[in-house]
C-alpha cells in the first residue's frame, strides 16, 4: 500500500466526526485528495503528503490550486521518519514549499 493511501486509512479511522470523500481525479490536475464535510455543514479540501525529509513535494498544479482556493483548503503532511503529522493551511502553500516540514503548522497530529 502506498504511503499516502496508508495516511488516508489513518485519517478515516481516527477522525470519524468528519465525512470523508476520496477524490480520484485524473482529469483536473492539482485537485486535493480528500473532500471533508463537517457536522456543521462545512466543506473543505485536504491534500495528503508523505515525506522522508524536510522537503514537501507539491506539483505546480497542487500549488496553483491552493493559491486559487486559499480558504477551507489544507495540506496534511506525515514525516515517515518520526511519524509526526502536521496540518498546514492551503494559504501557506508557498511557505510550505520554501520551508518544508519545519514550517510551523496550524495543527499537530490527528487528535487536535
Q: Can you describe what each PLM-predicted range is?
A:
Residues 22, 47, 75-77:
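Structural signal for conserved beta-strand scaffold positions within catalytic alpha/beta enzyme cores
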Residues 30:
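Beta-rich catalytic cores
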Amino acid at each position: 500500500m502506498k504511503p499516502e493511501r496508508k495516511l488516508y486509512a489513518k485519517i478515516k479511522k481516527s477522525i470519524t466526526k468528519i465525512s470523508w470523500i476520496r477524490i480520484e481525479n485524473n482529469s483536473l490536475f492539482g485537485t486535493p485528495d480528500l473532500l471533508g464535510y463537517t457536522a456543521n455543514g462545512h466543506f473543505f479540501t485536504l491534500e495528503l503528503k508523505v515525506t522522508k525529509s524536510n522537503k514537501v513535494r507539491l506539483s505546480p498544479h497542487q500549488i496553483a490550486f491552493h493559491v486559487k482556493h486559499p480558504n477551507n483548503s489544507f495540506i496534511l503532511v506525515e514525516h515517515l521518519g518520526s511519524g509526526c503529522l502536521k496540518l498546514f493551511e492551503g494559504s501557506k502553500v508557498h511557505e510550505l514549499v520554501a520551508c518544508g516540514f519545519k514550517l510551523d503548522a496550524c495543527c499537530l497530529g490527528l487528535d487536535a
